[in-house]
Every structure is written in structure tokens, then in C-alpha cells.
Amino acid sequence: MKRTYQPNKRKRSKVHGFRARMSTKNGRKVLARRRRKGRKVLSA
């Protein structure tokens, strides 16, 4: 059985990246939440 995590920089950015987050209303909510919490890294 293959492992579920097959690293791929492009997919990681497309799915979890900053611009992906900014492109939707809920994604912006995620960033706002993480800023409020004081996360050093906001997105992938």
C-alpha cells in the first residue's frame, strides 16, 4: 500500500497556499483566525 502523503510543492501551494486562502471568503476567515491566534506561519 502506498503512503497517503506524496509531497508536491505545486499542489501544496494550490490547495493550502496564501493565494488560495485569499481567493475565498472562508479562506480569508482562516487567515484572520490564524492572525488572531498569533501564528508565525499563516499558510503553506
UniProtKB/Swiss-Prot annotation:
Keyword list, A-Z: Ribonucleoprotein, Ribosomal protein
Presence of the UniProt keyword Cell cycle in the record: no
Signal peptide (residue range): none
Pfam family, one: Ribosomal_L34
Stored InterPro entries: Ribosomal_bL34, Ribosomal_bL34_CS
GO MF terms, alphabetically ordered: structural constituent of ribosome
GO cellular component, as recorded: ribonucleoprotein complex; ribosome
Biased composition (Basic residues): 1-19, 26-44
Kinase found in the keyword field: no
One GO BP: translation
Recorded superkingdom: Bacteria
Region (Disordered): 1-44
Family: Belongs to the bacterial ribosomal protein bL34 family.
UniProt xrefs under PANTHER family: LARGE RIBOSOMAL SUBUNIT PROTEIN BL34M (PTHR14503:SF4), MITOCHONDRIAL RIBOSOMAL PROTEIN 34 FAMILY MEMBER (PTHR14503)
The protein's name: Large ribosomal subunit protein bL34
Provenance organism: Geobacillus thermodenitrificans (strain NG80-2)
Protein's gene: rpmH
